Amino acid sequence: MTQMTPSDVPSMGRRQFMNLLTFGTATGVALGALYPVANYFMPLRAGGGGGGTSAKDELGNPITASGWLSNHPAGDRSLVQGLKGDPTYLIVEGSEAIGNFGINAICTHLGCVVPWNSGANKYICPCHGSQYDANGKVVRGPAPLSLALAHIDVEDDKVFVSQWAETDFRTGEKPWWT
């Protein structure tokens, strides 16, 4: 059996340093992996007293109410990035007004994006034919539920989207998406 000389045994300082380095690396990796998960459940808030998320166009740029209204006629329903980046319809109610609610464009059947059909005045899902009226209430299945709602607020020409937690005005029931 060979005996180790004192110079062969690592010093306690070196051992502590290696333990600290290993622990720090593992902690950094774990926190880095948890960051996107935390952002998914707690999206960053973009200014505004309403506490909502800034509505963004297809390029990810924040939308201004004046710019949106100048490019979209009354009655228009166009997609923006809403809560958690979900496609959400902004409704133009007049030449100077964006509706106070938006409609999440994700079908409640299998999650397809539901386009607005202006000729039929309803949303029609291309995947399995579910249909929703102009306010997003389901009128024909197989979708089991109406499209989710979101609050739309305009503050200082900025458009914000926030969670709808009140009674669903289309059904008179508690919202299924909260």
UniProtKB/Swiss-Prot annotation:
This is Cytochrome b6-f complex iron-sulfur subunit. The gene is petC. The Rieske iron-sulfur protein is a high potential 2Fe-2S protein. Component of the cytochrome b6-f complex, which mediates electron transfer between photosystem II (PSII) and photosystem I (PSI), cyclic electron flow around PSI, and state transitions. GO terms for biological process: photosynthesis. The keyword Ion transport does not apply. It is found in: Cellular thylakoid membrane. NCBIfam families: Cytb6fFeSPetC, PRK13474.1.
